[in-house]
């Protein structure tokens, strides 16, 4: 197995869900790289329909957290205090929008792990 293949498989094997975050802001350069990874995700018929929005403002992050918690029927922060929330918006009229957004999010999770 070549080095790139080995590194990719290792990345997939070692990625974990995180539920404890530092309060430090994410450097813009890293955030841009993670968002860029989302744009390389596969999508139905190559439409690249998901729109990715990084919410870095503490004020808006808190508002979105409260709205999502209410939808989930809880008062706990569904983002576990992460300093950035990435929203993947997709038009339900355009193909399998949930799957397209999910692929973009997975690419971003792998990129964040790699960085």
Can you annotate each of these PLM segments?
Residues 1-115:
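Acidic, surface-exposed loops and disordered segments
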